UniProtKB/Swiss-Prot annotation:
Record-annotated Link domain positions: 166-261, 266-357
Keyword Endoplasmic reticulum: no
Name of the protein this chain belongs to: Hyaluronan and proteoglycan link protein 3
Domain of life the protein comes from: Eukaryota
Compartments, as annotated in UniProt: Secreted, Extracellular space, Extracellular matrix
Signal peptide start and end residues: 1-17
GO MF annotations in UniProt: hyaluronic acid binding
GO cellular component terms, A-Z: extracellular matrix; extracellular region
One Gene Ontology biological process: cell adhesion
Keywords: Disulfide bond, Extracellular matrix, Hyaluronic acid, Immunoglobulin domain, Repeat, Secreted, Signal
Family to which this protein belongs: Belongs to the HAPLN family.
Length: 359
């Protein structure tokens, strides 16, 4: 396995507690976390309570349903079943608080917050306490703990849920480096996306994302992925990797942002029209076709997961004009696949339009 590099660009020569070399920090610990061995165990009265979950991350997509597996047993096995209390909660990440998901005691159960009406305990087998989660949302991605409580003893296991999606850089209509952290969060939400995590950006870099503009991530750090080192992007002397400026002030500092859009439940399409349209006409045309004008996140997801390939620029909901290319060809932009952009043209300029219809 080749060595992976994380580079911290900092005006300070060193930071206490980090191994530094020539002012740059290298690490192959990409996430700073592990799921352990997939189970927990505890001993009481000579009997061991064991909770088992999966060691592998689960992958799903927005709008889908998923089951987070969790089982428990006793060693040695008990002759008769015991009453247990089960609790599921989502762990804290990137400064967000822990979230209670579901508590079950016998036939009584209670779900919490945004999980109400979307979760239930699955008990198809004896000593199964898996969590069924419906209508997946972007914010459902993360680590969940399954805890089984038997009297004074409790044991737990972790399950990691990831939504399939695509990371894309996003820039304000005012130009480069115009978004503080809160504006970056809003910008991604308006595009049907959320601010990407470092893990999502790193995975996108592994898949070839190369972008020389620094952008906010979910933990309020500012980073950018480089596949081909070059002078304006950290210099030729640095290895490929994700460059980091570290944490930045939520309000005072301004950058672009990396957004994460989940795989689509619906369909994005280029609306065939005998004439080109202004932005207002484009919105109305999608509505007349029983759809709505596509967001940037929806267009990227359609390009990534549905293979949308069209060499015609079209309006999007944010007032930008873009087009998706899966198979690069003459007169359709650079030689690499991607979503091309014309920026934010005058709203009276005429283009096609990309519409989105939900299945």
């Amino acid at each position: 396995m080749s060595l992976l590099f994380l580079v911290l660009l900092s005006p300070f020569p060193c930071v206490l507690g980090l191994p530094f070399y020539n002012g740059f920090y290298y690490s192959n610990d990409l996430s700073g976390r592990t799921l352990g061995n997939g189970y927990g165990e505890g001993l009481f009265n000579g009997v061991k309570l064991v909770v088992e979950t999966t060691e592998e991350s689960l992958f799903s997509h927005q709008g889908a349903s998923v089951t987070l597996p969790c089982h428990y047993h006793y060693e040695p096995a008990l002759a008769s079943p015991r009453h247990v209390r089960v609790k599921w909660w989502k762990l804290s990440e990137n400064g967000a608080p822990e979230q209670d998901v579901l508590v079950v005691i016998g036939q009584r159960h209670r779900s919490f917050g945004d999980y109400q009406g979307r979760v239930q305990l699955r008990q198809d087998k004896q000593q199964e306490v898996s969590l069924e989660l419906r209508d997946l949302r972007l914010e459902d991605s993360g680590r969940y703990r399954c805890e089984v409580i038997d009297g004074l003893e409790d044991e737990s296991g972790l399950v990691e849920l990831e939504l399939r999606g695509v990371v894309f850089p996003y820039q304000s209509r005012e130009g480069r480096y115009q978004l503080n952290f809160h504006e970056a969060q809003q910008a991604c939400q308006e595009q049907g996306a959320m601010v990407a995590t470092f893990e999502q950006l790193f995975r996108a870099w592994e898949e070839g994302l190369d972008w020389c503009n620094a952008g906010w991530l979910q933990d309020a750090s500012v980073q950018y992925p480089i596949v081909l080192p070059r002078q304006p992007c950290g210099g030729l002397g640095l290895a490929p990797g994700v460059r980091s400026y570290g944490q930045r002030h939520h309000r005072l500092h301004r950058y672009d942002v990396f957004c994460f859009a989940a795989a689509l439940k619906g369909r994005v399409y280029y609306l065939e029209n005998p004439k080109k349209l202004t932005l207002l006409e484009a919105r109305e045309a999608c509505q007349e076709d029983g759809a709505q004008i596509s967001t940037v996140g929806q267009l990227f997801a359609a390009w990534k997961f549905r293979g949308l390939d069209r060499c015609d620029a079209g309006w999007l909901a944010d007032g930008s004009a873009r087009y998706p290319i899966v198979h690069p060809r003459l007169n359709c932009g650079p030689p690499e696949p991607g979503v091309r952009t014309f920026g934010f043209p005058d709203p009276h300029t005429r283009y096609g339009v990309y519409c989105y219809v939900q299945h």
